[in-house]
Amino acid sequence: MKIGILTHHYVKNYGAFLQMKGMYETLQRLYPEAEVTVINYVNQKHWRRNILHILHFRPGIDTLSTYVEKIRQLRTFTKYERSIPRTRPVKTAKEIIDLKLDLIVLGSDEIWNLCGSGYHPLKFGTGLENQRTIAYA
């Protein structure tokens, strides 16, 4: 069985990472024979906004040493984030269907935030109607 998780895996946020890791590990425990991966779908606008928010230099708050520390933390965070297997990069529902997943897990709740920069109908399952999907929050 092949299971894919569609989430905000690219957001540099501890909560986003921990919910992704928690879902990944839970699915591995529930389906030990399954191949569990994160669907490597990235909303570029959302990613840019997130990374620029992290990397911007705040005059009066950041110093050169605190900024260097911020970059070091980002690298460490990215290393742990990438320890969870991902599919090849995909941009459309058709490309997700072409992954031939037996189950697609949509979640957690933040992917359905209509007001956030990460909104995309694909995260609601648009285009995946004929696929076996479940959602969690």
Residue ranges and their predicted role:
Residues 5-14, 18-137:
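Aromatic- and Gly/Pro-rich donor/ligand-binding loops
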